[in-house]
Curated annotation (Swiss-Prot):
Biased composition (Low complexity): 191-220
InterPro entries: EF-G-like_DII, EFTu-like_2, IF2_assoc_dom_bac, IF2_II, IF2_N, P-loop_NTPase, Small_GTP-bd, T_Tr_GTP-bd_dom
Residue ranges of the region described as G3: 440-443
Matching PROSITE patterns: G_TR_2, IF2
Alphabetized GO MF terms: GTP binding; GTPase activity; guanosine tetraphosphate binding; translation initiation factor activity
Pro residues bias spans: 71-88
Region G1: start-end pairs: 392-399
Protein name in UniProt: Translation initiation factor IF-2
Family classification: Belongs to the TRAFAC class translation factor GTPase superfamily. Classic translation factor GTPase family. IF-2 subfamily.
Species of origin: Rhodopseudomonas palustris (strain HaA2)
Disordered: annotated segments: 1-261
Entry annotated with the keyword Ribonucleoprotein: no
Binding site for GTP: 392-399, 440-444, 494-497
Amino acid sequence: MVDTKTPGDKTLSMPSKTLTLKPRVEQGVVRQSFSHGRSKQVVVEKRGKRRIGGDGAPEPAAAPEVAKKPAPAPAPAAPSPRQQPRPSPQQQARSGMVLRTLTEDERSARATALADARVREVEERRQAEIEAQRRAAQEVVDKAEREAAEARRKAEEERHRHEEETKRKAETEAKKRFGETEPAARKPADGGRPAAGATTTAPRAPVTTTTTRPPAVAAEAGDDDEAPRMVRRGPGGGPARPAPPPKQPAAKPGASKQRGRLTLVTALNADDVRERSIASFRRRTQRLKGHASNEPKEKLVREVIVPEAISIQELANRMSERAVDVIRLLMKQGAMHKINDVIDADTAQLIAEELGHTVKRVAASDVEEGLFDVVDNSTDTEPRSPVVTVMGHVDHGKTSLLDALRHANVVSGEAGGITQHIGAYQVTSPESGKKITFIDTPGHAAFTAMRARGAKVTDIVVLVVAADDGVMPQTIEAINHAKAANVPIIVAINKIDKPDAKPERVRTELLQYNVQVESLGGDVVDVEVSAKNKTNLDKLLEMIALQAELLDLKTNEQRPAEGTVIEAKLDRGRGPVATVLVQRGTLKVGDIIVAGAEMGRVRALISDQGDTVDSAGPSVPVEVLGFNGPPEAGDRLAVVENEARARQVTSYRAHQKREKAASIVGMRGSLEQMMSQLKTTGRKDFPLIVKADVQGSLEAILGSLEKLGTDEVAARILHAGVGGISESDVTLAEGFSAVILGFSVRANKEAAAAAKRNGIEIRYYNIIYDLVDDIKKAMSGLLAPTLRETMLGNAQILEIFNISKVGKVAGCRVTDGTVERGANVRLIRDNVVVHEGKLSTLKRFKDEVKEVQSGQECGMAFENYTDMRAGDVIECYRVETIQRSL
């Protein structure tokens, strides 16, 4: 290869201009204003998009626009330069240049790039047109808004100009009419405010209102938001020359925080004087009031109502104190509490008194205040009938005596001829014509609670004692009840018609219990009567009337009624029915009543004769219909003013009743824990469901069943209530395999069918003693039987024999009693029992016998025991199983 240089060849050289990249980021500094005249400088950067020019150099960055102008429509793309014709090979040879021919792939790539460039150019042109249309529409909207704002500004300026003109005319007219001139203000102090207490007499020139506030005033004002806006005065007292308006509306340091805010209203009212806002005026007034009242405020003392338990938050609210202060006081006393903790009344009282408040203690039982024992005015009282309770031992003739007085026959209608309910009747005295109320009580031991209730509501107790029987246990109990109730006693010695009657013996026996009759020098009246022959009944009524006169029984009938529930039951057709003895006031139909935890409205009143009455006065027994549920016997009845008060009282009493029941259950649990583990785990329960006709009978049944319980077996009352046996009672009994007891009640059709279907036993009773005896026998069957040993005889071993197929056999002589085969035996060696078992073999000579008498010799063998020695003693005994009973 020859290295030659062709003429006309060009040499490689660098362009004269060096390629550089201009920065895309432009920096500027702007000042940002804040409230209270604060500002700071902020560096702003603007990044531009790098564009490459046609010659390969980057285009210069566009200068930042001062005002936003719509971008012009993009110019049409410049036509591509015309392609020059390719030089011929002769021309290439003459120029000395050798051009490389493009390959097919390169020509294809260039064609593709040109096509893509054309498509991209069309797309950019379309996007530019859309952007131009959007900018044009936005410009139209902006122009409309500017025109509307300009119109509003002009209208506002016109309104202000009209108001100023009207005001100026009014001032001029007033000056012309009255000839008054305003006093000139005194020269202001250094702070720009007039001196305190200064007075001026020089006339003051009219103040010219300036549309723009001078900067000097803004700089000197210490609190531009709070202090009133004043116009700066000149040295002569006249208005100072207005300062030129500021050239720029930018906020100055110390200016008000509102001057930096640009709103539409401030933009339109830029030439007006800024007035004090309502909020600023209120703040200034409050601050002045606060400075004026430097005297300490007097603490407001409140009367705080403190219940038995109260939370800290509630206590703080009632005292109008902060709960934090209350907790702080508790912490000083060494108690750590939270805001929702409950404290007792004593602690709450200490806190309230510590904070200077007065305390009024209240209790939950305050809802019962005013229900009972309200003192009546003596001028409003009138005499009332006496209430007499007949008490005594069973079968001493109490009910028969009342039947003779009432000319009725109650005894024949009673089950078993015994009284099991407490009854109330009214009898009219044949001589005086006055009414006497009698209350008949049961005499059996199971009805102790009934007798106690009868003694509490009575004025006089008639103690019936049989002349042939004398003083009995229930007679003594009746005497104790009468003394506990502090009521006088009249002794009625009954059955004097019997041949073996001994009234004197009765009087003598009563002396042992501090009951001294008049015939023996005492003050207790005694009357010998005969209920069967109706002997001396008029004398008994006369003694009762005389005793009532001595008691001087009076009450106020014109007041809300008070009374006592003697008996209560659940009647199937009438609902809850309560026998009530009215003691004070008058009970009327429609009254709202409360008795125990039950309330209601009186729907009907039924007298002892079965008649419906509208009202019942003092000492009148009536049946009351209208309770929500049957009350308990012995509850006190009261009439309240409205249902709200009745609900409060019943709610409180129901809560007390639940707490009492819970405490009893807890106490029983603690006693059971104190018992031994054997007794606790070994006790068997006898589940029962008891339904009775009246509350008093149910109470007596439950008391009797509770007394039957022991450490080994006890009656478990699943449910006890007043009324008939329902299907729900059968369902409950099925779940616990219990027995249902019905006392003077029956099961309805559905309950009887369900009991028969599920195999539940229902037992019906009319006499309480039959019920108690049956349950006692059933509970006795749950007791473990007692094992008792019966000694049969003793034998002494003389010699031991070894017999094949049998083993060791003891040759013995029976020393006492008899020895039986199969009986239990003990082997005693040196007075120590070494074996207990059964006698398996008993032979007399070579024959098997059942028993061997004393003095005879025999052979004995034990079951599974062969360690027998000569000289051992054998005890033979029999074990008997004896069934126990309660």
